[in-house]
């Protein structure tokens, strides 16, 4: 690759601190690799004295492979590693720390799962809850969340409990997680002169990729290691700082020149990835942020890009538009792998994934795709549908389904009355004949199931919510468990939209079986390279696709707020709004040729306002 002037300046840099502000698609990896090669081949630096830090194992592996493609014989001795790997090496060398002391990710999940079971915590989606729990534990340790702020976190009534139980679990087994690794490493370097002397003597040239993603503690460790030579070559983009929940903060990058005297500043401001229109619009957006280096990115791509705001009626029409567009564009020569569908949250992708499966479009998910049919509300509604279907067929029902919803809403039916795996509801009436009010409730349930069995799937959900009064149960459940009723209710409405495509309960059950099987395959099989990528904004960072769909570009979602409002625009504090704008900027700049921003007019029949960020693109 031929280097431009700014890239050359960065690559030729030898000593002293340098901050490279690298915009999207500006060739930052090439610059890091070429500069590493130059240090050895041109300036004679000992490879053993070079440390290249990345944020993921995949990035470290890629960086090393890119370097070795330039020079096999000059590659030996360079340390390519993640920050966590670096911390582990230091602790292993200067303390009794071993790999056995580090908790595995699977064990972290198991730990939180056991806490849920131990305290019988009432939660909706267990996988999402565990991920969020581990995030706020990390947030406390990295300083992104203060302990006193726990009350403001979703599932706040469990936050302190989970944190304390998790820490007790680690302590009892003499284990550390990755955040502990960082803290222990910092303390070691401060207290053990031999360790810091060794590291400074070995790592005389430090190159840091994705510098905008580091937290304060990681920054302190880098400064400790770099002193007094301060040969730090930091590469990042303040406009792509999107991990505040991990403690990342653009101010770290903005203060680099203050912390490292005589810093040279270079801006890589040519985007070789995206076409001109996409670059122009993303520039317009990000310039509304104030906490940033002032820069304007230009395009170095010959791609004739298209960027388009697509207004749709609702989520169903949004899904239909995306499916039809993918089918049409693949006929014109694009592969499935040329497409990405990006969402602000993982939950938003559930109904879209069901449509991809229904249309036999291969896809891969950057996250562990959650199954929309395994949520608390979905399981209740499916139990009602199963009861109605079985009762309509032979007047009997399965015990497991009846137990799940027999008191949703409250009917005072007791579990001990249901001993057989298959329940005859006529027999159940006889068992409660002496309890008039319960007898009436059972008769009412039988009548409801009988009528429910005659309905199509979508109207059946309306009947469950309003006539059977499951809606009232959700109101009480949300109140008792400090959850959002609106979010629970919307899960039911989302099921209704999915079921609207089916004429019978049999079709629904068959589709759910197929959906669950294919979802399980997606979790374990990433061998199919020709597949549409479904991802959140965060997980798409660093990737690129010829065609990108950004869904649900509506207020309250982009920018995102847990506290949705139906009256006017949601208000954000400046810091949160700027991070959300950076996140939208990152998602837009994943696109090479075509960018589609879809805007539903309604979500579950509720009127929605287009994202305020769309106004900033005009």
Mark where each language-model region is.
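N-terminal pre-P-loop "Q-motif" helix
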Residues: 1-15, 217
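A basic/glycine-biased coupling hinge at the interface between accessory DNA-binding modules
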Residues: 15-16, 37-189, 193-194, 201, ...
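Helicase P-loop NTPase motor core
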Residues: 20, 24-32, 261-264, 269-362, ...
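Conserved helicase motor core of SF1/SF2 NTP-dependent helicases
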Residues: 26, 208, 212-284, 295-300, ...
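ATPase/helicase motor core of nucleic-acid motors
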Residues: 259, 303-305, 334-457
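Helicase C-terminal subdomain and adjacent C-terminal extension
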Residues: 601-618
